[in-house]
């Protein structure tokens, strides 16, 4: 069974490990801890049969919701779970007063770009050399009409 919900303290070890397995410069335990029970930012986890397999972080800045992290264990990619996460982040972002949504994505991450485009995001800019390991540009994507 799939369940998507807000992060709880008991999820911190799992999401910290997922983050460390995916990113070269992962968030720390304390970064995720700061997402629990906040009104202007949050983190949603996705569980499969009671086990956390991924999540997504967001923060509301004066009505613009920035999606800062989307992560899913590699073996669960390509099964629609990322779509569920994006839908939940948009819902939670709207609940926090968000009107527009933005994110950055590696220019080479075509799977993620297609995911975001399928949820109404369009590329509106580029941050040159934004990412390290390897150095790469970031596309700045926006969804200004989230339904």
Per-range role (PLM):
Residues 3-75, 86-88, 92, 96, ...:
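Acetyl-CoA-dependent GNAT
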Residues 67, 101-105:
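Conserved hydrophobic beta-strand within the GNAT/NAT acetyltransferase core sheet
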Residues 73-79, 107-109:
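Active-site acidic-Proline motif in GNAT/NAT acetyltransferases
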Residues 78-91, 114-118:
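Conserved acetyl-CoA-binding loop-helix of GNAT-fold acetyltransferases
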Residues 79, 96-99:
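Short coil/turn segments at alpha/beta junctions that flank glycine-rich nucleotide-binding fingerprints
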Residues 82, 86, 109-112, 129-134:
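Short glycine/proline-centered loop/turn elements that form peptide/ligand docking sites
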Residues 104, 122-138:
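Conserved catalytic-core motifs of GNAT/GCN5-like acyltransferases
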Residues 116, 121, 141:
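Conserved active-site tyrosine of GNAT-family acetyltransferases
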């Amino acid at each position: 069974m799939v369940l998507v919900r807000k992060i709880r303290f008991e999820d911190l070890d799992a999401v910290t490990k997922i983050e460390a397995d995916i990113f070269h410069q992962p968030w720390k335990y304390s970064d995720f801890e700061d997402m629990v029970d906040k009104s202007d930012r949050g983190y949603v986890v996705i569980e499969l049969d009671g086990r956390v397999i991924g999540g997504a972080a967001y923060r509301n800045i004066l009505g613009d919701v920035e999606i800062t992290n989307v992560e899913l264990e590699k073996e669960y990619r390509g099964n629609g779970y990322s779509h569920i996460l994006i839908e939940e982040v948009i819902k939670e972002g709207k609940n926090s007063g968000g009107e527009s949504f933005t994110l950055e994505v590696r220019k080479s991450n075509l799977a993620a770009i297609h995911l975001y485009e399928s949820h109404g995001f369009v590329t509106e800019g580029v941050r040159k050399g934004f990412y390290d390991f390897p150095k790469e540009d970031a596309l700045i994507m926006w969804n200004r009409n989230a339904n």
